[in-house]
Curated annotation (Swiss-Prot):
Protein name as it appears in the record: Beta-insect excitatory toxin LqhIT1c
Subcellular location(s) of the protein: Secreted
UniProt-listed Pfam families: Toxin_3
CDD domains linked: neurotoxins_LC_scorpion (cd23106)
Signal peptide interval: 1-18
UniProt free text on domains: Has the structural arrangement of an alpha-helix connected to antiparallel beta-sheets by disulfide bonds (CS-alpha/beta).
Record InterPro entries: LCN-type_CS_alpha_beta_dom, Scorpion_toxin-like, Scorpion_toxin-like_sf, Scorpion_toxinL/defensin
Organism: Leiurus hebraeus
Tissue expression from the record: Expressed by the venom gland.
Length: 88
């Protein structure tokens, strides 16, 4: 019973503290284009307030965005490629 109550308390907190990854977009709905990761790291951390960023498939991919930030809709395959790059 205690475990169940703890689960009910922790689950909403995890949802609130969650971060997301993706191509952060500006007010026009476009993600910044890039050739180098250093530019993307600055763009993602200073403009979009993400944890870090890098260039993935010629657009800036931001890691650790807040849930209220808009991201570009992309295919699952493209997301897997960019998320795999984070691990490597």
């Amino acid at each position: 019973m205690k475990f169940f109550l703890l689960f009910l308390v922790v689950l909403p907190i995890m949802g609130v503290l969650g971060k997301k990854n993706g191509y952060a977009v500006d007010s026009k709905g476009k993600a910044p284009e890039c050739f180098f990761s250093n530019y993307c790291n600055n763009e993602c951390t200073k403009v979009h307030y993400a944890e870090k960023g890098y260039c993935c498939l010629l657009s800036c991919y931001c890691v650790g965005l807040n849930d209220d930030k808009k991201v570009m809709e992309i295919s699952d395959t493209r997301k897997k490629i960019c998320d795999t790059t984070i691990i490597n």
